[in-house]
């Protein structure tokens, strides 16, 4: 049985995620008080094998220790995943301004900016327990729904999921990355006229980068690092590890390196996922 707990700051996309899971067959409950969570799970345990609930700042206990006790009281037979959504303060302010919605904490005589910052502190206990963190800054509604399907429903087992993500430094480092590697020192296909319009998924770019000893060594050293520490990460009960590879624009070098790493680890690891952030823009 699976239980997905969705939380995050207001405006980060919790409702979108919940609707996506409902479309995929999950029994969904929106904004349930945390102290009712054990009752809900015990009630539906015999009727549903996939349940998703969203929890916002209004439904958290004041004592962080109480939250831990409630989560620990949930049925041990359930496979629980805590998904935490977030976005930058500027993006959240923009979203509230566009929708003209009131922030849940605005009734406490706080400015919108102050309410957003206060919410971050109040949600810290559940954010710290999150198995999966998703930054929705640059995601459309459809991209967020697809990412959730990929990250959660794409899991093939209870083992740790390796996520390899390419990105461009000029667009910012992914906030959900556990490890970040800089590939900007590698030979750049951008300066080759025939390769410039292509991506790291195209054969000519693969041949160009694959023939460079420095590229091969870079990939091998990342493989060695991840392989060395992967058993320790698994023993730590991690659900996801995101390895982000960045180049300038996220089009050639980082894409190629991610593809090579994913290809290598997929032969020995049951759950490997790929995301090319800039190619999906």
UniProtKB/Swiss-Prot annotation:
Q: Which residues bind GTP?
A: 56-59
Q: Does the keyword Ribonucleoprotein apply?
A: no
Q: Where does ATP bind?
A: 8-15
Which keywords, in A-to-Z order, does the entry hold? ATP-binding, GTP-binding, Nucleotide-binding
Q: Which GO terms describe its molecular function?
A: ATP binding; GTP binding
Domain of life, per UniProt, equals Bacteria
> What's the stated role of this polypeptide?
Displays ATPase and GTPase activities.
- Which family is it part of? Belongs to the RapZ-like family.
Can you say what this protein is called?
A: Nucleotide-binding protein Patl_0571
Q: Which organism is it from?
A: Pseudoalteromonas atlantica (strain T6c / ATCC BAA-1087)
Q: What is the lineage of its organism?
A: Bacteria, Pseudomonadati, Pseudomonadota, Gammaproteobacteria, Alteromonadales
């Amino acid at each position: 049985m699976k239980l997905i707990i969705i939380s995050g700051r207001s405006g980060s996309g919790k409702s979108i995620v919940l609707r996506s899971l409902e479309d995929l067959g999950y029994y969904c409950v929106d904004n349930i008080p945390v102290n009712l969570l054990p009752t809900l799970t015990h009630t539906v345990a015999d009727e549903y094998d996939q349940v998703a609930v969203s929890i916002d700042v209004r439904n958290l206990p004041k004592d962080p220790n109480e939250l831990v006790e409630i989560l620990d009281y949930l049925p041990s037979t359930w496979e629980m995943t805590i998904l935490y959504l977030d976005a930058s303060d500027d993006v959240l302010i923009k979203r509230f301004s566009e929708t003209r919605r009131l922030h849940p904490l605005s009734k406490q005589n706080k400015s919108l900016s102050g309410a957003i910052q206060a919410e971050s502190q109040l949600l810290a206990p559940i954010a710290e327990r999150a198995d999966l963190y998703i930054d929705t800054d640059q995601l459309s509604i459809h991209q967020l729904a697809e990412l959730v399907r990929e990250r959660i429903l794409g899991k093939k087992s209870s083992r740790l999921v390796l996520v390899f993500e390419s990105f461009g430094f000029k667009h910012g480092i992914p906030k959900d990355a556990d490890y970040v590697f800089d590939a900007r020192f590698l030979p750049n296909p951008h300066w080759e006229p025939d390769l410039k319009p292509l991506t790291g998924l195209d054969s000519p770019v693969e041949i160009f980068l694959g023939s460079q000893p420095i590229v091969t060594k870079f990939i091998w050293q990342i493989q060695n690092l991840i392989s060395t520490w992967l058993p320790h990460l698994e023993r730590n009960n991690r659900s996801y590890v995101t390895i982000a590879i960045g180049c300038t624009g996220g089009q050639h070098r980082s894409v190629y390196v991610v593809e090579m790493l994913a290809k290598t680890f997929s032969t020995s690891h049951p759950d490997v996922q790929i995301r090319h952030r800039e190619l999906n823009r």
